[in-house]
Amino acid sequence: MSLVLTDLRVTYPDGDRVLTAVDEVTLQVDAGQLVAVVGPSGSGKSSLLAVAATLLRPDSGRVVIGGVDTGGLSAAGRARLRLAEVGIVFQQPNLLASLTAVEQILAAHHMRGRSVRQQRRAAAELLAAVGLDGKQHRRPHQLSGGERQRVNIARALSGRPSVLLVDEPTAALDHDRGRQIVELLAEITRQHQVATVMVTHDTEHLEHADEVVEMRDGRLSALSSHR
C-alpha cells in the first residue's frame, strides 16, 4: 500500500490576491518508507499534510491512498477512507487529562467493534510497541513530553493504517527525546509496513528517514536518499 500525490495545487484567497500554498507537488511514499518533508514555517508543509490526509481538497491534482483515488469520493467517502487507512500524529498530543495511557487508546474510534478483551490486548500491544510497556495506567501528567507523544503515535496506529502522517513530532521535545521519537517512527514504519510522511522544520535526526525532501514556497525538491 502506498500514498501517491500527483501535481497537487492548493491556493487560498488573500484579499485581492490568491496565495499558492502547494504548487504542482508530486510525491510517492511506499509501504515501509519514511519520507521527511522539511522547510520553514509558511512553506506549505501543513497544507500538503492536510491534503494527504483528505482533510483539505486540492484545487487540482490527485491523492491516491492504497490504490484509491480520493478525487471522486464524497466527503463521507473520504472520511471512511481516512478512518480505515490513515493515521495522523498531530504536533500536540491532546490527550484527555482524566484518562490513562491505555484508556486513551481504548477511546479511539478505531477500537469500536472489537470485544473488550480484544480492545485491551490491542491497546497494551500498541503501547508496548512504542516503548510504554509498564506505563499503561499512567495519566498524561505522569508522563514526560516524549512519552505523551508515544501515546499519540500508538493512538494513530490503533486503526492499523496503511498511511501514517506525522506533523512536527519533535517540536516540543529536547534533542534526545526528539531523536528517540524519530527513531521510533522509523522502526514503526518498517515493522508495520506503513507509508509514513513526517513534516518537520527540525533538520536534526533526518538520517532515520529513507528520503528527505525540502518544501519552499509550495514546491518540493529532493535533498537526499539515505537507503
Identify the function of each model-found stretch:
Residues 16, 70-87:
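ABC ATPase NBD coupling module
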Residues 38-40:
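The feature captures the beta-strand-to-loop junction immediately N-terminal to the Walker
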Residues 61-69:
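Conserved ABC transporter NBD signature motif
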Residues 83, 138-141, 159:
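Conserved signature/switch motifs of ABC ATPase nucleotide-binding domains
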Residues 99-107:
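Short coil-to-helix segment of the ABC ATPase nucleotide-binding domain corresponding to the Q-loop/switch region
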Residues 139-143, 147-149:
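Conserved ABC ATPase signature
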Residues 164-167:
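Catalytic Walker B motif of ABC-type/P-loop ATPase nucleotide-binding domains
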